[in-house]
Amino acid sequence: MLTGVPAAQRQAIKGHPPGVVWLTGLSGAGKSTLAAALETSLIRRGAHTMLLDGDSLRSGLNSDLGFSTHDRAQNVLRAAQVCNLMVDAGLLVIVAMISPLAQARELARSQLRHTAFLEVYINAPLAVCELRDPKGLYKRV
C-alpha cells in the first residue's frame, strides 16, 4: 500500500507491531464478549487497537450479502481487506465473526500474510450456544 509513513516508523510511533487476532466459532460462543475483553486489556497496556465485529460488518459494509457459500466467503474476504487497511495504519485488529468456511478463513490469512495473524476458535459447547442464542438461530420450530 502506498503510504507516506514507513511501517517501521508507524511501529515506533505505536510502540508495537501491527497484527490480527481472528476469533471464530459458533453463534453464541462468546466471540464478541472475548474480543471486547481482549481489546480492553490491550488498550490498558497502551496498544492501538480496532475491533471488527461480524454483526456490525453485516449491518454495514456487508449488508448486501446473504448467507450463501459465496456470500459467506465474501463476508470474510471484505473483513480481511478492512484488516489490511488497519494493519497498514499500525493497529492491532481483533476480528470477531463466525466465519464458518475454512477456505474463506485461509483466504483471509493469505490476504494478511505480511502481518502476524492469529486465528482462535472459541470452542463453546453447542448446548451453551443454544442456551445463549442471541440471534434466535438455534430456535426450534
PLM features per residue range, with description:
Residues V21, L52, L118-V120:
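Hydrophobic/aromatic beta-strand patches that form the interior of the parallel beta-sheet core
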Residues K31:
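Conserved lysine of the Walker
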Residues A7-R10, A80-Q81, R105-L107:
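A generic local structural motif
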Residues G28:
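Walker A (P-loop) phosphate-binding loop of P-loop NTPases
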Residues A36-N84, D88:
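Conserved substrate/cofactor phosphate-moiety recognition/catalytic segment
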